[in-house]
UniProtKB/Swiss-Prot annotation:
Changing F121L: In PAH deficiency; mild. Changing D415N: In PAH deficiency. Changing Y377C: In PAH deficiency; severe. The gene is PAH. Pathway: Amino-acid degradation; L-phenylalanine degradation; acetoacetate and fumarate from L-phenylalanine: step 1/6. This is Phenylalanine-4-hydroxylase. Changing K42I: In PAH deficiency; severe. CDD domains: ACT_PAH, eu_PheOH. Changing D84Y: In PAH deficiency; severe. Keywords: Allosteric enzyme, Disease variant, Iron, Metal-binding, Monooxygenase, Oxidoreductase, Phenylalanine catabolism, Phenylketonuria, Phosphoprotein. It comes from Homo sapiens (Human).
């Protein structure tokens, strides 16, 4: 038998919302103090009656209960119950009895919101719909210093792009856009200028994939690629996919998408009055900066590792992971032979900074995540400092080691077959993982034998 305690989950939620997990969730949309309890029992006569009797003896009032066959163990049933908030004082004793007398495995979210609470995180790729529209800035609204603030045509256009993102749901094809001539002109200026630097300044992986994007995705000076075409291409390369977004997401939400190999991508383009400047990510930054390297297996895995590390992490570690992301995925340099090349999207989409970062002006340091994670950075001018990775694989291992220091009571892995995050917090989940690894090792050994 196993149980999980959740606080403030929202009384409208059903057992089916929780999938097959023992769930670590704090749902911030309900603050009424109610408690929900998930537990599983072996399918035998009187099993549920024992638990209900335990509740009665401890003056616990059930306001809702539902059941279903367990998705983890065929001989068990799962029960989802709502407990009256007045039952809170008895909860500690109930959990103690479940653990010691009934042999339950209990996972509890703290009832003290000031400490130890695990933040909510998406468990299925469909749950990205929950926060994709919770943007922090821009979208259809522009600040007064934005180049397009006084342009009514540009503002109306931005609203069109925002509406596309707001109405999008996972599984739908990304709507195609008929870009205007002025938008194509802006793209062409950026594309032509940056492409002239890629062979000498961009990393090998970037230059390897860029011709394929030209061939299969319409990366041309006179054409703005469609996100749906690019997303389909990415999925065939690394399993990454694009999802339209209206503006900037919080660090937690954005990194959470990477855990599912989903990149939240803007569809609008910068204002034509300043083609070489944008105060926000736009389609030039996304497609010319990010997309080529999301097509590389090693870099895609590295990016996903950052996302997985963010799931359920405390706020202070989200800030550290966001800083690591900034100095790697956005503004990273790497060694290649005797040279140093750029792989960060912020560099590969900025003509001026791409030249500057490989000059003698900035300071270069080796990538050490303990130091990188707390390094201050600027968002209004070129970076005075860049971190140099030995390789994508080296950076990936460093992220894994850093993730091991994050204080959370579980580990996670992504299941690409079900597109779910598996929380590894019980022996059943570990057995499933071990079986999967054993199967992969068997394939590896068989292949090695045939190669010999």
């Amino acid at each position: 038998m196993s149980t999980a305690v959740l606080e403030n989950p929202g009384l409208g939620r059903k057992l089916s919302d929780f999938g097959q997990e023992t769930s670590y969730i704090e749902d911030n949309c309900n603050q009424n103090g109610a408690i929900s309890l998930i537990f599983s029992l072996k399918e035998e006569v009187g099993a549920l009656a024992k638990v209900l009797r335990l509740f009665e003896e401890n003056d616990v009032n059930l306001t809702h209960i539902e059941s279903r066959p367990s998705r983890l163990k065929k001989d068990e049933y799962e029960f989802f119950t709502h407990l009256d908030k007045r039952s809170l004082p008895a909860l500690t004793n109930i959990i103690k009895i479940l653990r010691h007398d009934i042999g339950a495995t209990v996972h509890e979210l703290s009832r003290d919101k000031k400490k130890d609470t695990v933040p909510w995180f998406p468990r299925t790729i469909q749950e990205l719909d929950r926060f994709a529209n919770q943007i922090l800035s821009y979208g259809a609204e522009l600040d007064a210093d934005h180049p397009g603030f006084k342009d009514p045509v540009y503002r109306a256009r931005r609203k069109q792009f925002a509406d596309i993102a707001y109405n999008y749901r996972h599984g739908q094809p990304i709507p195609r856009v008929e870009y205007m001539e002025e938008e194509k002109k802006t793209w062409g200026t950026v594309f032509k200028t940056l492409k002239s630097l890629y062979k000498t300044h961009a990393c090998y992986e970037y230059n390897h994939i860029f011709p394929l994007l030209e061939k299969y995705c319409g990366f041309h000076e006179d054409n703005i690629p469609q996100l749906e075409d690019v997303s389909q291409f990415l999925q065939t390369c690394t399993g990454f996919r694009l999802r339209p977004v209206a503006g900037l997401l919080s660090s937690r939400d954005f990194l959470g998408g990477l855990a599912f190999r989903v990149f939240h991508c803007t569809q609008y383009i910068r204002h034509g009055s300043k083609p070489m400047y944008t105060p926000e990510p736009d389609i030039c930054h996304e497609l010319l900066g990010h997309v080529p390297l999301f097509s590389d297996r090693s870099f895609a895995q590295f990016s996903q590792e950052i996302g997985l590390a963010s799931l359920g992490a405390p706020d202070e570690y989200i800030e550290k992971l966001a800083t690591i992301y900034w100095f790697t995925v956005e503004f990273g340099l790497c060694k290649q032979g005797d040279s140093i090349k750029a792989y960060g999207a912020g560099l590969l989409s900025s003509f001026g900074e791409l030249q500057y970062c490989l000059s003698e002006k900035p300071k270069l340091l080796p990538l050490e995540l303990e130091k990188t994670a707390i390094q201050n950075y600027t968002v209004t001018e070129f970076q005075p400092l860049y971190y140099v990775a030995e390789s994508f694989n080296d950076a990936k291992e460093k992220v894994r080691n850093f993730a091991a220091t994050i204080p959370r009571p579980f580990s996670v892995r992504y299941d690409p077959y079900t597109q779910r995050i598996e929380v590894l917090d019980n022996t059943q989940q570990l057995k499933i993982l071990a079986d999967s690894i054993n199967s992969e090792i068997g394939i590896l050994c068989s292949a090695l034998q045939k190669i010999k």
